[in-house]
């Protein structure tokens, strides 16, 4: 005879998953925030395309975790990987083609892929090449993926475009000029896109994390710089990827439909 806990778990498993039947692309999903977003969405029922640009092994590891720990839906493979340069239109189109071929119509696109300059130069010290590199991935990449999503994501309900920005846009900090400018552009682009998608029931929002304990955050920072980030937060800690992913999944769900054209800053009250 099943225990009370076992009965409760069985009942929970029978409940419809909030992202059940949905298909999602998550860019930059091989590590960091993107990895956790992909894992969280899969746990909530979505089939997920794990996009990566260089680290195939890490991307395949994420897909393996999802496929080895699938909800009891019996629908086979629920995650695949796909390499693409998000700043190249043809490769972005191929990414979407791959997703549709594997899983059918798309519902959710999370544009998370991003880069920064771990040397943290001032604007006066920022090279043309570095400025262009950051804008190519962070801004053009988000634009190309959002443009493709606007054409391909399902209409009539359940369509979601979620761009990952940064709380730095709301707190201009020296030596993040190119990165912050690229994310500011993404925020305004997203708000305009939401208005242009009027009548489709596709929502477009930004999630803007504060400092999160990822490889990208730690790269090039001294212990003192990290500690300063910790102390500046009311919680006196860095954010965790687990602080961000559930919010993204909420925006992707039916419950998040009335949130549209918004920038949601998730930073523990830092700004």
Curated annotation (Swiss-Prot):
* Top-rank taxon: Eukaryota
Which positions carry the signal peptide feature in this UniProt record?
Answer: none
Enzyme class (EC, first level): oxidoreductase
Where, by residue number, does the polypeptide cross the bilayer? none
Sequence positions that bind substrate: 166
Task: Please name the PROSITE patterns in this protein's record.
Answer: ADH_SHORT (PS00061)
| Active-site residue numbers | 179
Q: Which EC number(s) are documented for this chain?
A: 1.-.-.-
Name a GO molecular-function annotation.
oxidoreductase activity, acting on CH-OH group of donors
Alphabetical UniProt keywords: Oxidoreductase
Matches recorded under InterPro entries: NAD(P)-bd_dom_sf, Sc_DH/Rdtase_CS, SDR_fam
Residues holding NAD(+)? 25-49
Q: Which family does it belong to?
A: Belongs to the short-chain dehydrogenases/reductases (SDR) family.
Name of the protein in question: Short-chain type dehydrogenase/reductase
